Amino acid sequence: MISIELIRKNPEYVKENLAKRDMFLKDRIDDILKLDEERRHKIKRIEDLRALRNAKSKEIGSLKKQGLNTESLEEEIRLIKEEISKLEEELARIEKYTEDLLLRVPNLLHESVPYGKDENDNVEIKRWGEIPKFDFGIKDHADLGVLRGFIDFDQATAISGSRFSILKGPLAKLERALINFMLEINAKNGYQEMIVPHLVKPQTLVGTGQLPKFQEELYYVKDDDLYLIPTAEVPLVNVFKDTILKEDDLPINLTAYTPCYRREAGSHGKDVKGLIRQHQFDKVELVKIVHPDSSYDELERLLSNAEEILQLLELPYRVVALCSGDIGFSASKTYDIEVWIPSQNKYREISSCSNCEDFQARRANMRFKDKTGKNRFVHTLNGSSLAVGRTLVAIMENYQTKDHKIRIPKVLKDYIKGECI
């Protein structure tokens, strides 16, 4: 959530920054400012009426001591109380509406974020690894998986509908090996592993920014008023909801493996075939809770930690800086890591590493006490390390052989016996 104080103090800066994402956000800021002015006016009026009520109450006390009639003053106080009550109801409505508007305003962008309209304007930062060359006709991961009897899309569809899959035997073991490998590398890099709930309260998703804006993307359990998590970022960040940390506790580094659940409501017709875009998929997540002064150094560290996984797996990838029109709602700056997918002859996203600055911390009330004793909001960062299903896709396609086998990356030999599956 953007600070209302910042909007009040420097509205033009806020509007210009948000306009890099969407010109129409300027109007929302104007609406918030009008409501804020109305709110402050009503607060002032309530305070004045309370002062008047108190003064008249004292006057009544004085008159009663003198044995004088106080009926007219008592009627005035009754009317004042009615007006205060009415104003307080109006104030509560204004504050609720203002909060609703603020919760739908995205984060401010860091000055280094490139301007652009969509993913075509993202800026490539680096490439790593050699793109493999094949002397045979390659298969995409879906066809290869079905051919080998490792993936069953038809039965998954019969069980659950479209965009689900069943992994079998060696491929299921390879996915499990990847999860363990990723968690162990993350632990080596100083992240504490956690096992977190997969069902969360609505307010938990408000804290990380998925609600209220992206409700249609989420699976909701109505009877229990709980949502299935779209990413482990949600419970990991909220571990410190309504908490005041010690400055010396920072940074806090967390990692978790979870299945993730997304309705993909806006993805009709995209990646219909295969494992790239599923309603349920495995992901290993990284979250950092850090001091505001070091959050951009921590973003580079987060990116490096996610890259290390791909480097150890010897999978070619590139890093892009997301432009203003493609960056996520809660992020101030984001790097995407895109892995090479031979069958598509292009790089595809496998991780997003974002600095949300204090945007999530304000929504989830996450603070730390600095050395002067002042409570300040922390900065939060998150990144995939990695999307397991897409990593599996990349291995299947980049490591495939002429006889339709899949070679095992060297670093996974401790997890899976043999050269190929």
Swiss-Prot record:
It is found in: Cytoplasm. InterPro entries: aa-tRNA-synt_IIb, aa-tRNA-synth_II, aa-tRNA-synth_II/BPL/LPL, Ser-tRNA-ligase_type_1, Ser-tRNA-synth_1_N, SerRS_1_N_sf, SerRS_core, tRNA-bd_arm. ATP binds at residues 262-264, 349-352. One of its GO terms (molecular function) is ATP binding. Its main location: cytoplasm. It is an enzyme of class 6 (ligase). It comes from the Bacteria. One of its GO terms (cellular component) is cytoplasm. One of its GO terms (biological process) is selenocysteine biosynthetic process. It catalyses: tRNA(Ser) + L-serine + ATP = L-seryl-tRNA(Ser) + AMP + diphosphate + H(+); tRNA(Sec) + L-serine + ATP = L-seryl-tRNA(Sec) + AMP + diphosphate + H(+). Belongs to the class-II aminoacyl-tRNA synthetase family. Type-1 seryl-tRNA synthetase subfamily. Homodimer. The tRNA molecule binds across the dimer. Catalyzes the attachment of serine to tRNA(Ser). Is also able to aminoacylate tRNA(Sec) with serine, to form the misacylated tRNA L-seryl-tRNA(Sec), which will be further converted into selenocysteinyl-tRNA(Sec). Consists of two distinct domains, a catalytic core and a N-terminal extension that is involved in tRNA binding. This is Serine--tRNA ligase. It comes from Hydrogenobaculum sp. (strain Y04AAS1).
